[in-house]
A protein has these predicted regions:
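Conserved non-cysteine loop/helix-boundary elements of the Radical SAM core domain that shape
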Residues: 51-58, 94-107, 121-183, 193-214, ...
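Hydrophobic faces of well-ordered beta-strands that scaffold small-molecule active sites
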Residues: 19-23, 88-90, 121-123, 147-151, ...
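Canonical Radical SAM [4Fe-4S] cluster-binding loop centered on the CxxxCxxC motif
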Residues: 14-59
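Intrinsically disordered, low-complexity terminal tails and inter-domain linkers enriched
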Residues: 73-85, 215-241
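Short catalytic/ligand-binding loop motif for oxyanion handling, primarily in non-cytosolic enzymes
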Residues: 30-31, 51-53, 99-101, 255, ...
Length: 332
């Protein structure tokens, strides 16, 4: 089983190890402020998936420097005692990172992208929070350094989408992908494995969909090219658009969420480790060989993790996944 890891992709593109730094822009979410809902997605913690991000009261530059220090403290020293260094992805992670006035976004994103050690600006957001002014800003920034947009699709199944309170239909995701790709912006799609009520085939259907292509026409959609060196053409036949990467996320049940309440009431069970490993293997087999696998599991804060408890041992999970991959093939 061959797959293209984020690590190998970044080394291929930038010639060195690239580390991700979680940045907190102090955003909220339309699923929390009452615009769509006030409860948030059913699985989302009070940190808006930014449990490991820095303090939002700090400047972007300060957050980057603090993150760098943490990374560098774990790096091996060279022969002269100096730390080996790499480059960084500035990842705006917590809540919805395009849900603010565009000038505020410009200020935050420009500060990040102009940092000399940042080689990629990555922005996690909702497909329904990508207005024309935001898209134009991202396009401008993409001319300076590569911009990635991470979209939380989670599932293609509307029943599941309603249960998790995603708050938008599949068509909105498709339009967002087209609008980003026609501007040459790379797209990474998040998928949750283990949602209540979904069979393994349901989950594989979502993964196959993400690995496929979105058909035109969508209004104002143009040719799918990318302005950044190192990114392959993503336009399929007959004007079809593809995303460049995927994050496979194990469903984590986090304390304080409505999902935790349902779990404790026995409304669903979480995947076991062996089930998850086999499912990830099938997911990778279902994806195009050139799609970048940005994540195969995920991190949940141990102190608030309700289930599955085996996922708290990330080293064990990654070893199980890597052993399976080594037995079945190689990593590209």
């Amino acid at each position: 089983m061959e797959y293209r890891s984020l690590n190998s992709y970044m080394k291929e593109r930038f010639g060195c190890k690239v580390y991700k730094l979680a940045i907190n822009g102090g955003f909220t979410c339309p699923n929390r402020d009452g615009t769509i809902d006030s409860r948030g997605c059913i699985f989302c913690s009070g940190y808006g998936s930014g449990d490991f991000a820095e303090d939002a009261s700090l400047s972007v530059t300060k957050q980057i420097e603090l993150g760098k220090k943490r990374v560098e403290s774990k790096m091996p020293s060279g022969g002269n005692g100096a730390k080996s260094t790499g480059k960084y992805i500035a990842f705006f992670q917590a809540f919805t990172n395009t849900y603010a006035p565009v000038e505020r976004l410009r200020e935050l994103f420009t500060e990040a992208i102009k940092h000399p050690d940042v080689v990629v600006l990555s922005i996690a957001t909702r497909p329904d929070c990508l207005g024309e002014d935001v898209l134009e800003l991202l396009s401008e920034l993409n001319e300076i350094k590569p911009v990635w947009v991470e979209l939380g699709l989670q599932t293609i199944h509307e029943k599941s989408a309603e249960y998790i309170r995603r708050g938008y239909p599949l068509k909105v995701y498709e339009e967002a992908v087209v609008n980003l790709r026609k501007r040459g912006i790379e797209v990474i799609t998040h998928v949750i494995l283990g949602l209540p009520g979904e069979t393994k085939e349901d989950m594989l259907e979502t993964v196959r969909y993400v690995g496929g292509a979105i058909k035109l026409p969508y209004e104002n959609a143009g040719k799918d090219t990318c302005s950044n060196a190192g990114v392959k053409e993503s336009k399929g036949e007959n004007g079809m658009y593809r995303v460049q990467g995927i994050k496979l996320q194990l469903l984590h049940v986090i304390e304080g969420t409505d999902l935790a309440k349902d779990y404790r009431e026995g409304k669903f069970e979480c995947l076991e480790l062996d089930e998850y490993v086999e499912l990830v293997r099938k997911c990778i087999e279902a994806l195009p060989r050139d799609m970048v696998i940005h994540r195969m599991t995920g991190d949940g804060a141990k102190k608030t993790l309700v289930a599955p408890l085996w996922s708290a041992d990330k080293k064990r999970v990654l070893n199980a996944l890597n052993n399976t991959n080594e037995q079945g093939g190689k990593m590209l």
